[in-house]
């Protein structure tokens, strides 16, 4: 099989036809002017009657049947349902005996990993930008250290061995103290 390029040098020709006052355009030429001449441009008019539908290799029988049913509902004569890797092998002229592979390794996996990486990079850069003035704080300017919450677990080394304030409060203890103060206030109001 040899695919011959069209007059624009492309191996595919878009299904577009356009009519202007002076000419008829087909393919890329018609597609390129659709925004300026939408009324006189025709596209998406193919009538497919029969189809071989491809599905991801990990689809089970009920998913394959649901896909076939969907095709039938739309009016297609579904000739066959085949796995996407099988379709690719056939397209390359390979005689497929069997297929195997990682069904969860594809473009989306790489996309997700890139998105996660870029989100982390952005968060880190933005975090540093938002807190730049705090990072410039000189350790010598700190008189006492009171840590609350997760910070209570930081090492004293950062502060050159400076003793932590004896009233170090964890999140739980902080909540208890806060509730006790609130409760104490309610009792005082009741005594009045």
Curated annotation (Swiss-Prot):
A GO MF term: ATP-dependent protein folding chaperone
| A GO CC term attached to the entry | CatSper complex
* Short name of one Pfam family: HSP70
InterPro entries recorded for this chain? ATPase_NBD (IPR043129), Hsp_70_fam (IPR013126)
Residues with the modification N6,N6,N6-trimethyllysine, per the entry, are 186
The leader peptide range reads: none
Which positions does UniProt annotate for ATP binding? 46, 150-153
User: Which keywords, in A-to-Z order, does the entry hold?
Assistant: ATP-binding, Chaperone, Cytoplasm, Cytoskeleton, Differentiation, Methylation, Nucleotide-binding, Spermatogenesis, Stress response
Swiss-Prot/TrEMBL GO biological process terms = cell differentiation; spermatogenesis
Localisation per UniProt entry: Cytoplasm, Cytoskeleton, Spindle
Q: What does this protein do?
A: Molecular chaperone implicated in a wide variety of cellular processes, including protection of the proteome from stress, folding and transport of newly synthesized polypeptides, activation of proteolysis of misfolded proteins and the formation and dissociation of protein complexes. Plays a pivotal role in the protein quality control system, ensuring the correct folding of proteins, the re-folding of misfolded proteins and controlling the targeting of proteins for subsequent degradation. This is achieved through cycles of ATP binding, ATP hydrolysis and ADP release, mediated by co-chaperones.
| Family note | Belongs to the heat shock protein 70 family.
Matching PANTHER family, A to Z?
Answer: HEAT SHOCK PROTEIN 70KDA (PTHR19375)
* Subunit structure of this chain's protein: Interacts with FKBP6. Interacts with ZNF541. Component of the CatSper complex. Interacts with RABL2/RABL2A; binds preferentially to GTP-bound RABL2. Interacts with SHCBP1L; this interaction may promote the recruitment of HSPA2 to the spindle. Interacts with MOV10L1.
Listed name of the protein: Heat shock-related 70 kDa protein 2
């Amino acid at each position: 099989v040899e695919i011959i390029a069209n007059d624009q040098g492309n191996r595919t020709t878009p299904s577009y036809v356009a009519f202007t006052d002076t000419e008829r355009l087909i393919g890329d030429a018609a597609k390129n002017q659709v925004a300026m001449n939408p009324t006189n441009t025709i596209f998406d008019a193919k009538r497919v009657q029969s189809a071989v539908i491809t599905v991801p290799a990990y689809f089970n029988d009920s998913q394959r049947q649901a896909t076939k049913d969907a095709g039938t509902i739309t009016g297609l004569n579904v000739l066959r349902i085949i796995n996407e890797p099988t379709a690719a092998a056939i397209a390359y002229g390979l005689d497929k005996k069997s297929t195997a592979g990682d069904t969860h390794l594809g473009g989306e996996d790489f996309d997700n990993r890139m998105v996660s990486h870029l989100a982390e990079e952005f968060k880190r850069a933005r975090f540093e930008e938002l807190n730049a003035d705090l990072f410039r704080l000189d350790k010598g300017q700190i008189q006492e250290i009171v840590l609350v919450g997760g910070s209570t677990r930081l090492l004293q080394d950062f502060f050159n061995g400076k003793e932590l304030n004896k009233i170090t409060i964890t999140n739980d203890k902080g909540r208890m103290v806060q509730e006790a103060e609130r409760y104490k206030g309610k009792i005082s109001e009741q005594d009045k």
